[in-house]
């Protein structure tokens, strides 16, 4: 039974789902993408609800790596976050604005995220957002 997990970057103990997802987001923001992926289950389901659903770390890396690589800065501003459960089985939901600085200009869009923690890893990551707003934000860059 997994009750704690170490942050792959700082090696700090993480004992609750809320802190775990917060550290996951911080790792992405700080360009610690490999460390963030260590926090994801090998068979994780990643669902960008209006676009596509993929399964497994490799597929998640394929979806995100190009987009993140094009950004000189990444900020995921969490406005609200709620969590329940523990590191064995927990759920975290957040409302956030994901921001990416691309070619000197910020591209941003609003997200509602759902993370299910199972056995100390993110087993399900689902992001809900407006596809049209996302497309328009990218077109303005």
Task: Locate the predicted segments by residue.
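Short, low-complexity N-terminal intrinsically disordered segments enriched in polar/charged residues
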Residues: 1-42, 140-141
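Low-complexity, intrinsically disordered terminal/linker segments enriched in charged
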Residues: 2-5, 124-141
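Hydrophobic pocket/interface hotspot
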Residues: 24, 35-37, 44, 56, ...
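A solvent-exposed, acidic/Ser-Thr-rich amphipathic alpha-helical stretch
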Residues: 33-90
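Short, surface-exposed coil-to-beta transition loops
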Residues: 76-78, 107-112
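A short hydrophobic beta-strand element
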Residues: 88-98
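Short, cysteine-centered beta-strand-loop-beta hairpins and adjacent loop/turn segments enriched
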Residues: 99-108
């Amino acid at each position: 039974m997994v009750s704690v997990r170490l942050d792959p970057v700082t090696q700090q103990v993480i004992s609750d789902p809320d802190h775990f997802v917060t550290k996951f987001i911080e790792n992405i923001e700080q360009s610690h993408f490999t460390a963030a992926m260590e926090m994801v289950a090998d068979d994780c389901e990643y669902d960008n609800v209006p676009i596509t659903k993929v399964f497994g770390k490799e597929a998640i890396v394929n979806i995100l790596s190009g987009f993140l690589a094009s950004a000189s800065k990444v900020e995921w501003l969490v406005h609200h976050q709620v969590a329940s459960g523990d590191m064995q089985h927990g759920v975290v939901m957040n409302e956030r604005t994901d921001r990416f600085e691309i070619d000197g200009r910020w591209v941003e869009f609003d997200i509602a995220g759902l993370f299910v923690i199972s056995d100390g890893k993110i087993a399900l990551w689902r992001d809900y957002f407006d596809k049209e707003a996302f497309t328009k934000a990218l077109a303005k860059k």
